[in-house]
């Protein structure tokens, strides 16, 4: 895109994660399993479920890698992301499609002192990262990307982008969630049509009171649906997952889940009740209205 101004677009494979074609990017931490199969068939065994090659996850949430595409096509700014510190600081390898496993979070309860990585996406010439005020160094940005080794320490991560003359251009932060933990549920539709074919996608997350998602550790969330609607699906964006999507409980992935509610063919209200051990239950009500007839 930088070298050829006549380019007007880019084909991304894939934009969004999908079921099947398991582990197309061949993500692995360490060596491939040793067996008689071709290399491209190893490391994809059950319970691998998703292709895990998109820049939007299965629930429709953009992943940090999407910022690199934005910058390549003329965008400006700075974003940062961190690896969940449960891999002993190992950087995964990929055959294609992906290049990092970091997420836009700095909330990893129980991981104090464990090694991690912090990624910076920016069109600045150089980037510097601070963890609770301590600099991790300053490095040139190559192809809109810079990577910093770190040890997890609850608090705040600050990334600063500089131009070629050393002047500050951007800054951005990630903060650790506070101690109080709640369930949140946000439907993309706040009313449905009573035709049996209308859906509301409810984004569910474990957060603090300020809305910062608690991405680790994971929790099992239970769901109950009654009234003028049914549960069409309930699951996470976890690419390695043996849990079903048609059950009334599921484990979060990076603190998130999604429930899909189908309207009934009769008007009324559909009630969605969510619960998890140690957390206050949450109930949301979605009106289901008769379709307007012209």
Predicted regions and their residues:
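Short aromatic-acidic-glycine turn motif
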Residues: 180-184, 223-240, 292-294
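Short beta-strand elements
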Residues: 170-179, 279-294
């Amino acid at each position: 895109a930088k070298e050829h101004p006549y380019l007007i677009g880019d084909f991304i494979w894939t934009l969004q994660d999908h079921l099947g074609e398991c582990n197309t990017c061949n993500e692995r931490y360490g060596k491939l399993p040793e067996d008689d199969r071709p290399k491209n068939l190893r490391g994809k065994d059950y319970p691998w479920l998703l292709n895990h090659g998109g820049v939007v996850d299965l629930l429709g949430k953009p992943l940090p890698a999407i910022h690199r595409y934005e910058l390549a096509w003329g965008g400006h700014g700075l974003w940062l992301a961190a690896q969940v510190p449960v891999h002993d600081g190992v950087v995964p390898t990929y055959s294609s499609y992906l290049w990092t496993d970091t997420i836009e979070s700095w909330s990893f309860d129980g991981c104090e002192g464990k090694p991690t990585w912090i990624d910076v996406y920016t069109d600045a010439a150089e980037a510097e990262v601070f963890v609770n005020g301590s600099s991790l160094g300053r490095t040139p940005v190559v192809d809109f990307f810079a990577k910093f080794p770190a040890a997890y320490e609850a608090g705040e991560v600050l990334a600063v982008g500089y131009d070629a003359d050393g002047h500050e251009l951007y800054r951005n932060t990630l903060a650790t969630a506070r101690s109080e933990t709640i369930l949140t549920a946000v439907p993309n539709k706040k009313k449905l049509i009573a035709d049996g074919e209308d859906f509301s996608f409810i984004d569910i997350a474990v957060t603090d009171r300020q809305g910062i998602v608690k991405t680790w550790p994971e929790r099992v969330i239970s769901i109950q649906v009654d009234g003028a609607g049914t549960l069409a699906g309930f699951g996470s964006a976890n690419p390695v997952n043996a849990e079903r999507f048609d059950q009334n409980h599921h484990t979060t992935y990076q603190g998130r889940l999604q429930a899909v509610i189908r309207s009934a063919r009769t008007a009324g209200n559909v009630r969605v009740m969510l619960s998890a051990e140690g957390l206050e239950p949450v109930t949301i009500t979605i009106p289901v209205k008769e379709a307007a007839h012209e």
